[in-house]
Structure formats: C-alpha cells, structure tokens
Amino acid sequence: MQPTTEPHNAILVEKTPLETYVPPAKPSLIGLSRNELADRLGEIGVAPAQRKMRVQQLWHWMYFRGAQNFDEMTSISKGIRAELAQHFTVDRPEVVAEQISNDGTRKWLLRLPSGDNVEKAHEVECVYIPETDRGTLCVSSQVGCTLNCSFCHTGTQRLVRNLTAGEIVGQVMVARDRLNDWADREDGTRRVTNIVMMGMGEPLYNFDAVRDALLIVGDNEGIGISRRRITLSTSGVVPNIVRAGEEIGVMLAISLHAVRDELRNELVPLNRKYPIKELLQACRDYPGASNARRITFEYVMLKGVNDSLDDAKLLVKLLKGIHAKINLIPFNPWPGTAYECSDWDQIEKFSEYIFNAGYSSPVRTPRGRDILAACGQLKSETEKLSARERQTLRAMAMTD
C-alpha cells in the first residue's frame, strides 16, 4: 500500500522542544564530566587539593562498579559520602515496564522524573538485543521526535524535550543493572558490548548532551565501551555530521531509506532541508571514515515503495566513493502503519545486487516482534493503560 504523499509545506525540521529539563531537588551526578564533578565537590566543601582524587573515586564507583548509592563507595571517607548523599544522588531512570522476547531481546520503558512533579515525568525506551558475538543496546536521545518519518512509530509521538547527558548514560547503566553486567560479574564478560543511538529522537538535534554522554560511555576508566563499538545514527542533520566525527569520533550510521529525493521527502521529511546530495557529501567528509571504519547506511525495506532492483542500482551508484556498508532492515510493522514489509525473496534479490557490486549488505534479523520492539511501541502501548495497570507494570519491573 502506497501512503499518500504529504504536501511540500509539511516539512518538519528542528523545533524547540515543548518542555525544558527541570532537575530534581537533589540532582544526580550521572552524566557530569570530571570537571563538573570537581565543581560539585567544591560546592560541598571538598578542598581543591583533594578534588582530583575524589573525582577519580566517584568515576570508578559510578561507571566501573555501578554503585547505586554513596554508601557503596567505601574508598571515599564517610564524611564526604554523607555530604554527597545530602546534596546529590546517583539515581538512574526508573524501570516502569520490562518486556522479554522469545528471542532474548529485552525492552525497557524508563521514567525520567521532572523535578518533584511525578505527573510531568516522561518516559523513553531502550532495547537490549543479544547475539552470539555481541550484545547491542539501543539508546534514546529525546522524548519523542520532531522528524515525522512516515514509517517510524516514534514519528507519531510529539517531541517533548531533549534528554540530558545523565539520562542518556543512565539508560546504559540501567541495562547493566538489569543484566548484572558490572565489574563484579563472575565470568568477567560483558553482556552490553555495543551501543547504538537508534532509539527515540534525532541524536544530532540534541548534540551537546549526546556528545557528553558518549564520551562518558566510551571512557576507558569507566563504562569503557570502545568508540568503534558505538554507533550514532542520524536521519541527516548535515551541519552536525562532520562535527560529530570531530568531537565524538564514533561510528556513523545514516537513515537513508530512499535513493530519490521525491520519495525520501515523504519517508524522511528532513530531506527537504538536507537533500540526498548534501547528505552524501557530508558522509564523504566524515572524519576517520575508512574501509575499517565504514559508514552504515540504513535502508528499511518497504513493499512496493523502495525495494525494486532499480532502487538497488541507484543506491550503489549514489554510494560510489564512500566507505560504506548497507544495512537492510525488514520493516517491523506497528499498529496503524500504512506500510508493509518487503517480501523476503525481494529483500534477498536487493541484497544480492548490492553485495555483487562490492558492498556488504547484511539483512538485519527481525528481533523482538512479539514484544513490539520497534522504536516507540512500548511507550505508546503503556500510555493506553489505566493508572492501575501502569502501577502493576511498575511493580513487576521493580521486583523482577
């Protein structure tokens, strides 16, 4: 089924979020840089000569050991721990719902308090996808999204606000909490080995917070996920693509999904501001791109929309000269969508053509379909529940 094309003036680009972040009365230290932590220590009277050491201790306990309160930080003096507990927390987002798929995929709905007003608390999703050789965590960057991509469920949800660096890092910490994945894990392995910024929101429209969060996640003295195992996905915010390479230095993925501007204008309305030619030039200019650090182009397979062999041929032509791989994504249906997933035979033909042209073209294995694991679905479904049902979900998540 071919959806109706929106009028040209329906373009949705970067908008001011409806709300700004209101910190709790006792803010969390999660997401602060080392310099910011030193400033907070100064606020509670820690002498300048001690701050560097105390920052390193805090960093170790928060990001390497996963401490959930200051009492666990036994290498820090009791007096400083008491002052820290009086003024700050190391709280993560609250798990209000958890779903576990038959294939092992886990999806969490996380509550982000706004000040002391529980009624204004917002929720985001993150998803853990276990595979034989890795465990990938899909992380959100905004509450809702402004881009209105027609095939994406999050596009049906309004943009409420940007996440803070702490709320982004907090998703990784929640996953490690739930998976028992901190330094004291008996077998010494890690379940969360890869991070993808492919959850709710457009990361490059929340650049500073995403940058600060990913620098913390990639820090070798803490969470320690290599930057080569962190992928930032964008729908094509061209001015911030090269900047991301310079200031963050992680792997880049582009939500392409179409090879002609007319169709991409419909699927990804941001294309009307930054068309394909400009987007691909930014990819060619991305710092550090090489055969070993290829840019991933994501391409959702929509039946009768973008899955012809002519589309595959033009895709190969467009990507000439770019160190690239193409990730073909079978469409994950959601209630109310007008799209269907391409037939499997057609996906294989599309993939084979790209592969024969010299590009890696893996087909992403659909995961978590039994738990509505496509981005934004759990949030939408829980919003339909009554208050009593939501309280029951929260209790189950907390006691699981």
UniProtKB/Swiss-Prot annotation:
Keyword Cell division: no
Compartments (UniProt record): Cytoplasm
Cofactor binding note: Binds 1 [4Fe-4S] cluster. The cluster is coordinated with 3 cysteines and an exchangeable S-adenosyl-L-methionine.
SUPFAM superfamilies documented for this protein: Radical SAM enzymes (SSF102114)
InterPro entries: Aldolase_TIM, Elp3/MiaA/NifB-like_rSAM, Methyltransferase_A, RlmN_N, RNA_MTrfase_RlmN, rRNA_lsu_MTrfase_RlmN/Cfr, rSAM
Disulphides: 138-375
Pfam families, per the entry: Radical_SAM, RlmN_N
Keywords, ordered alphabetically: 4Fe-4S, Cytoplasm, Disulfide bond, Iron, Iron-sulfur, Metal-binding, Methyltransferase, rRNA processing, S-adenosyl-L-methionine, Transferase, tRNA processing
One record GO biological process: rRNA base methylation
Residues binding S-adenosyl-L-methionine: 201-202, 233, 255-257, 332
Listed EC numbers: 2.1.1.192
Ranges where the Radical SAM core domain occurs: 131-372
Catalytic activity: adenosine(2503) in 23S rRNA + 2 reduced [2Fe-2S]-[ferredoxin] + 2 S-adenosyl-L-methionine = 2-methyladenosine(2503) in 23S rRNA + 5'-deoxyadenosine + L-methionine + 2 oxidized [2Fe-2S]-[ferredoxin] + S-adenosyl-L-homocysteine; adenosine(37) in tRNA + 2 reduced [2Fe-2S]-[ferredoxin] + 2 S-adenosyl-L-methionine = 2-methyladenosine(37) in tRNA + 5'-deoxyadenosine + L-methionine + 2 oxidized [2Fe-2S]-[ferredoxin] + S-adenosyl-L-homocysteine
Top-level EC class: transferase
GO cellular component: cytoplasm
CC cofactor: [4Fe-4S] cluster
Binding annotation for [4Fe-4S] cluster: 145, 149, 152
GO molecular function per UniProt: 4 iron, 4 sulfur cluster binding; metal ion binding; rRNA (adenine(2503)-C2-)-methyltransferase activity; rRNA binding; tRNA (adenine(37)-C2)-methyltransferase activity; tRNA binding
Residue numbers annotated as active site: 125, 375
Record's function text: Specifically methylates position 2 of adenine 2503 in 23S rRNA and position 2 of adenine 37 in tRNAs. m2A2503 modification seems to play a crucial role in the proofreading step occurring at the peptidyl transferase center and thus would serve to optimize ribosomal fidelity.
Note, other: Reaction proceeds by a ping-pong mechanism involving intermediate methylation of a conserved cysteine residue.
Family the UniProt entry places it in: Belongs to the radical SAM superfamily. RlmN family.
Name of the protein in its database record: Dual-specificity RNA methyltransferase RlmN
Lineage: Bacteria, Pseudomonadati, Pseudomonadota, Alphaproteobacteria, Hyphomicrobiales
Gene: rlmN
